[in-house]
């Protein structure tokens, strides 16, 4: 079987039927490791918070009115106002609280490391990260994750290829003339798919440029800013249209996220090509 497979691969390679797989370079791989470490830390932080909150709930300790969970005021309340009769429960509370604080410190430390890593990236990667932040719903961490998971966006000839890479396209079950489309395939990059779906929730709001988004867009060219504004209008209309047709919010946001990938591709390719032309013009 191995010999037959090898011969088949050799024939496919000779005929040009094989598609090369992108292998991340050292810079992309290092950034990907750091970004995924931060994601793991956030998930551990969520688990630690759940343990503490469920422990307090199980013993009837309710958060005071006007106090939001996991703020400094909330943690001060846990440390000073929550007490138990038995020493074993006091130790349990102390341990859960320590884990929550440790997880928060870990996330903050990794986010500082990501900031430092961005400053050390090649100019082209930094430019794409800045440009992607012109899109509503995509701040620095989301842009860095996209860059780390995808690499150069210009390696995709068409935005549909990027959509398929993320696994955000519809699955298909076809037999003869009968075509059946189902839920998204989820066969692509789960990290990329998660980021764009989270970002897509921002487009349920009417198009607008707030203070935070305006600050991010200062680092982008007018062409990139125009594409980001076009994305706001188009994706909000898409969201409103699908909701109006009775689609559930999760399905709608997934569809908007898939279309958002098209704008991510357009902006990334625009910046990469623009930077690749400049050195030749200077020469």
Task: Give the positions of each predicted feature.
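Short, solvent-exposed helix-loop connector elements
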Residues: 21-37, 65, 88, 178-184, ...
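Glycine-rich, often acidic, oxyanion-interacting loops/wings at catalytic, nucleic-acid
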Residues: 36-131, 216-222, 230-232
